[in-house]
């Protein structure tokens, strides 16, 4: 327990908050270029082929980002927008690609939850 004199000499240091998405550099989204598009398998007990991409960001970082939804048109040199948000069963994947912006097209034939997958309202 410090004395009052010690507290006057040097105040208590605030605990620094560690960000969960450092590559965004405090921005809500970042633009980047895909360097590799591939599939990977999740941790136990899940089993699938999850679509992910290595993305070189404008902030200088190279990160792994998840491609949500069924089917995608991304390939090497595609320009994408990424947001924060990890994928729980893929270690090291802390970002999501935003569908329906830049080169990432929205999910085809999506009827519900369209805004999350960049799909326009279907004509009736």
From Swiss-Prot:
Keyword Transferase (UniProt)? no
Modified residue 3-methylthioaspartic acid is at which positions?
A: 89
Gene Ontology biological process terms, A to Z: translation
Swiss-Prot/TrEMBL keywords: Methylation, Ribonucleoprotein, Ribosomal protein, RNA-binding, rRNA-binding, tRNA-binding
Per the record, its GO cellular-component terms are:
small ribosomal subunit
UniProt keyword annotation of RNA-binding present = yes
Q: Which GO terms describe its molecular function?
A: rRNA binding; structural constituent of ribosome; tRNA binding
Which superkingdom? Bacteria
Task: Please name the InterPro entries in this protein's record.
Answer: NA-bd_OB-fold, Ribosomal_uS12, Ribosomal_uS12_bac
Q: Where is this region: Disordered?
A: 1-28, 101-124
User: Where is this chain compositionally biased, Basic residues type?
Assistant: 113-124
Q: HAMAP family, alphabetically?
A: Ribosomal_uS12_B
User: What does this gene product do?
Assistant: With S4 and S5 plays an important role in translational accuracy.
NCBIfam families annotated for this entry? rpsL_bact
Which family, according to UniProt?
Belongs to the universal ribosomal protein uS12 family.
Q: How does it assemble?
A: Part of the 30S ribosomal subunit. Contacts proteins S8 and S17. May interact with IF1 in the 30S initiation complex.
Q: Specify the protein name.
A: Small ribosomal subunit protein uS12
User: What is the organism of origin for this protein?
Assistant: Crocosphaera subtropica (strain ATCC 51142 / BH68) (Cyanothece sp. (strain ATCC 51142))
């Amino acid at each position: 327990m410090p004395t009052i004199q010690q507290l006057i000499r040097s105040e208590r240091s605030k605990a620094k908050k560690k960000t969960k998405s450092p590559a965004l550099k405090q921005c809500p989204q970042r633009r980047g270029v895909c360097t590799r598009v591939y599939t990977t398998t999740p941790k136990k007990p899940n089993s699938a082929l999850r679509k992910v991409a290595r993305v070189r960001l404008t902030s200088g970082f190279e990160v792994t980002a998840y491609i949500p939804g069924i089917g995608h048109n991304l390939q090497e040199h595609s320009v994408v927008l990424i947001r924060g948000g990890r994928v729980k069963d893929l270690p090291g994947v802390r970002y999501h690609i935003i569908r329906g912006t830049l080169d990432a097209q929205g999910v085809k034939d999506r009827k519900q939850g369209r805004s999350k997958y960049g799909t326009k309202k279907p004509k009736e």
